[in-house]
């Protein structure tokens, strides 16, 4: 959740542990509260525990489209 505090300061919840994080240069890992939470999130993406939803991924299975990708 994002909340606005005084003087245009925003606070967001860390996506991993839900701790409040001030959205400013003093929080270098934002939106995460720490390097640890940032790495946990990265690990979840790398392990394919998280993904961007897609209705149809036929383009990945189409050999004609795959040829184009292989040339690069």
Swiss-Prot record:
The keyword Nucleus does not apply. GO terms for biological process: regulation of DNA-templated transcription. InterPro entries: DNA_gyrase_inhibitor_YacG, Znf_NHR/GATA. HAMAP family: DNA_gyrase_inhibitor_YacG. Keywords: Metal-binding, Zinc. The lineage of its organism: Bacteria, Pseudomonadati, Pseudomonadota, Gammaproteobacteria, Pasteurellales. GO terms for molecular function: DNA topoisomerase type II (double strand cut, ATP-hydrolyzing) inhibitor activity; zinc ion binding. This is DNA gyrase inhibitor YacG. Inhibits all the catalytic activities of DNA gyrase by preventing its interaction with DNA. Acts by binding directly to the C-terminal domain of GyrB, which probably disrupts DNA binding by the gyrase. It holds the Pfam family YacG. Binds 1 zinc ion. Zn(2+) binds at residues 14, 17, 33, 37. Belongs to the DNA gyrase inhibitor YacG family. Its cofactor is Zn(2+). Gene3D superfamilies: Erythroid Transcription Factor GATA-1, subunit A.
């Amino acid at each position: 959740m994002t909340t606005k505090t005084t003087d245009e300061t925003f606070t967001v919840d860390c996506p991993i542990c839900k701790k409040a994080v001030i959205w400013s240069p003093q929080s270098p890992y934002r939106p995460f509260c720490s390097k640890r939470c940032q790495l946990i999130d990265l690990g979840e993406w790398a392990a394919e525990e998280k993904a961007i939803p897609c209705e149809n991924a036929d383009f990945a299975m189409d050999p004609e489209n795959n040829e184009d990708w292989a040339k690069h």
